[in-house]
Each structure stands twice: as C-alpha cells, then as structure tokens.
Amino acid sequence: LNFSRSEIEALLRESFARGDQPLLHVSGDATLAAVLDAMQAVGSPDAWRALRPRIEHGEGLAADQVARARAFGIVLVQNPAHFMLPPTETAYMQAHALQPLADVLKGGIALALGSDGPPNPWLNMMFAIAPVSRPDQALSREQVLRAYTSGSAYAEFSEHEKGKLAPGYFADLAVLSQDVLDVALPAQALPATASLLTVVGGEIAWRDPAF
C-alpha cells in the first residue's frame, strides 16, 4: 500500500462527495481489500454503483471478493500482459486463487481490457486466452474483443456512443489482416495481426498500401 487506509478513505470520500468516478491503481489482494473497506465506510453500494468505480489492474482480486466487488459496481480494467509473471508470482497467484478473470465475468463484474505495455492488443489477446498464471481463467476470443471494445466504453460512461458498430455510434473500425476470432488461428499467431484499414470518426486514418 502506498497510502494508509485513512488516506484511501479520505480520497474516496472526496471523490464520492463530488460524484466523480474514482480510478484506483490497485495491485495485490490486501490493497483491494483496503479499497473495498474504505468504500463501504464512505457510502452505500447503491450509491457507488452509479459512479462505476474503476479498479485499474486489480490482479489481486480474489475469488471470494468477486461478490463484494460486484455489489459496489466495480469496473475491472485489466491488462492481460500482467498475466505473464515471474514463476514466484505465478505460484502465489495460483495458491491464493487471484486473477479470477473468467470468474469475474461469470460473477457479473464489468470487465474492460487495455494493453498498457506492450501496446499490441493482439499480443494481449493471446495472453488473455492462454494466461500462464491462471490457465483455468482463460477467456474466449469473443470475450476479449468485447472487453476491449464495449467493456472499455462502459468503463468511461461512453457505451451509448462507442464500443460497437451500430447506427448513431462513432464510425471507429479496423479491417484486420486475419480473423482473430477464428479458433483455427493459433494463439501464437495473434500478435502478428495488423490493420489493413483503420477508420476513426468515419475518416480513414491508415490504409495499408497493398489494401
């Protein structure tokens, strides 16, 4: 913990009073427990749900914390590259049932995925569908794509304008060099995926010269 529990509570109380969405950089199981305790001291779960509090990373989320996190409307914003941990950390994650990503979705917690570093989203898709630290918590390719798109839009209160291709939504899209949802495509081949055409706001931002 970089902050004391009283400091965490004070920061959350200030955010709660303003009606601001809190974004908390959380790693480790003890840290998340402290955040949830502070949230409980500040306001009711119903009031917190309206703010969609974001937990960035949150790899310390334990299976027995899922129901509590859902009650407060936690949005988990995870970076699959963090699943590639040194063996000592991987053993700890497995022993303490941390990083229950599949269970997070089953438990009704909103999930958004981002790349952090390295920035390649398809490398991160590979990590998410075949996580070394918790292979039992692998996501499907469709779940990963949904978390990257509509999940990320929900995390920033913009789910009615982006996150999917639909009338009235931003015309942001990409034509890819291969079908990332095809299970016949090996997971190891995903990082080589490239954009042949990228459209942002209806305008072409990138086109492969050969496309």
Residue ranges with predicted function:
Residues 210-211:
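Residue-level structural signal for beta-strand termini and adjacent loop
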Residues 71-73:
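Structural alpha-helical segments in enzyme catalytic/regulatory domains
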Residues 13-24, 30-53, 57-58, 63-67, ...:
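His/Asp/Glu-enriched, well-ordered alpha-helical/loop segment
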Residues 1-10, 58:
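Active-site gating/metal-coordination segments in enzymes
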Residues 4, 184-189:
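Residues that cap or delimit alpha-helices
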